[in-house]
Amino acid sequence: DDCGGLFSGCDSNADCCEGYVCRLWCKYKL
């Protein structure tokens, strides 16, 4: 998943949707 590579602290899709910035990325990814 791109989240882990683009945003540090987001190791998985689940973590992606938890963090603020990561959550924004998750929304755009969907």
From Swiss-Prot:
Disulphide-bonded residues: C3-C17, C10-C22, C16-C26
Keywords: Calcium channel impairing toxin, Disulfide bond, Ion channel impairing toxin, Knottin, Neurotoxin, Potassium channel impairing toxin, Secreted, Toxin, Voltage-gated calcium channel impairing toxin, Voltage-gated potassium channel impairing toxin
GO cellular component: extracellular region
SUPFAM superfamilies: omega toxin-like
Top-level division of the source organism's lineage: Eukaryota
Compartments in which it is found: Secreted
Tissue specificity remark: Expressed by the venom gland.
Main location: secreted
Molecular function (Gene Ontology), one example: calcium channel regulator activity
Keyword flag Phosphoprotein: no
Pfam hit, one: Toxin_12
Domain notes: The presence of a 'disulfide through disulfide knot' structurally defines this protein as a knottin.
Similarity comment: family membership: Belongs to the neurotoxin 10 (Hwtx-1) family. 19 (HpTX2) subfamily.
Function recorded in the entry: Inhibitor of voltage-gated potassium channels of the Kv4/KCND family. Blocks calcium channels (Cav).
Protein name per UniProt: Kappa-sparatoxin-Hv1d
Organism: Heteropoda venatoria
